[in-house]
């Protein structure tokens, strides 16, 4: 699975639950909330003041290291 800024957080977490650590790290502690699960990575990063490209790169590097 490759993550993009348009990827929906709920979809990411359903397929790769270990990625929750990256969302927690940016202060997104409401991962179970329906609203946050429907947000794109880009939307969540905007709300939490985080660079979406950097977060996407971190998550994709993590996922690549698993394979």
Predicted regions and their residues:
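Domain-level signature for proteins that mediate thiol-based redox and metal-cofactor handling
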Residues: 1-67
């Amino acid at each position: 699975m490759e993550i993009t800024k348009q990827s929906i957080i709920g979809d990411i977490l359903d397929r790769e639950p270990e990625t929750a650590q990256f969302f927690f790290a940016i202060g997104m502690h409401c991962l179970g909330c329906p609203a946050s699960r429907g947000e794109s990575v880009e939307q969540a990063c905007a709300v939490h003041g985080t660079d979406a490209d950097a977060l996407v790169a971190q998550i994709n590097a993590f996922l690549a290291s698993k394979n």
